[in-house]
Regions:
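Conserved N-terminal substructure of TIR/SEFIR domains
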Residues: 1-62, 66, 71, 81-89, ...
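Short amphipathic alpha-helical segments
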Residues: 4-6, 108-111
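Conserved beta-strand scaffold positions in the cores of enzyme catalytic domains, especially
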Residues: 90-92, 112
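Glycine-rich, charge-decorated loop segments at or immediately adjacent to ligand/cofactor-binding or catalytic sites
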Residues: 98-109
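Output/docking surface of receiver
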Residues: 109-126
Length: 138
């Protein structure tokens, strides 16, 4: 069931997709921790990320070629995989085809939510996890 708060791990190069996803999730009542809106000027961003990872109870991972190359995405995922509270609460979101094994071979065992063909269908599937329902344009 979605969530008290979800952590959204992503590459900054996927900003357009991620901003659209965050807006959609928030419109559907899902509280999202997202670095672009949750880290304020003059804050220590690495400390803020760490605090959010410790606080959030779901981990959404946006997968793309740039995410696979991101040191921070890899660090965030490694942390999430080590936390019991994220068991069955790590959801890979396939934004673009990529070699996700480079992040972690464990990802092959997860059920992905595929956004490659349709953003709306991807959102519908993701929100179904929490029984929140999805209404395009909401």
């Amino acid at each position: 069931m979605l969530p008290n708060e979800v952590f959204l791990s992503h590459s900054s190069q996927d900003q357009d997709f991620v901003a659209r996803l965050v807006e959609t999730l928030r419109r559907h009542g899902v509280p999202v921790w997202y670095s672009q809106t949750n880290i304020l000027a003059a804050q220590q961003w690495h400390d803020e990320i760490g605090q959010a990872l410790r606080r959030c109870d779901w981990f959404l991972l946006v997968l793309s070629p740039s995410a696979v190359e991101s040191m921070w995405v890899k660090r965030e995922l490694t942390y999430a995989l080590q936390q019991n509270r994220f068991e069955n609460r790590i959801v890979p979101l396939l934004h673009q085809s990529c070699d996700f094994d480079r992040l972690s071979w464990v990802l092959a065992s997860f059920q992905f939510v595929d956004f490659q063909q349709s953003f709306d269908e991807g959102c519908r599937e993701l929100l179904r996890l929490g029984g929140l329902g999805y209404q395009p344009g909401r």
